[in-house]
Amino acid sequence: MMSDNKVERLLEELQITNPAGYELVQAARQVVYSVVPNASERVMYGGFMFSGGEQFCGVFAYKEHVSVEFGRGCDLQDPHGVLEGSGKLRRHIKLFTPTDIKAKFLELYVDAAHRQV
């Protein structure tokens, strides 16, 4: 698990300004690190971008949900029908509650995204 001071500062800010979002972000980060223990993490675009050589996903907190973004999500298989987005490349999974992490098979999609880069 490699992160930097910017990651810690953004987490601290989130904890104060969006406690529910902070908890979901932390849970999503745990999933990423459980799948890719050596992932590196940095702050980009107001969220947390994860790389394992190449960027494979990002975690972003919004007022009502947390979004896990996949830059090449268009190439991911979606057997559970949870990927959202209709753009050319990007897809995302919206998390509203901690139970969404398992219900939307986040670990499976993070693993698939990491394997495709």
Model feature map: region roles:
Residues 1-117:
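Charge-dense, helix-prone N-terminal extensions
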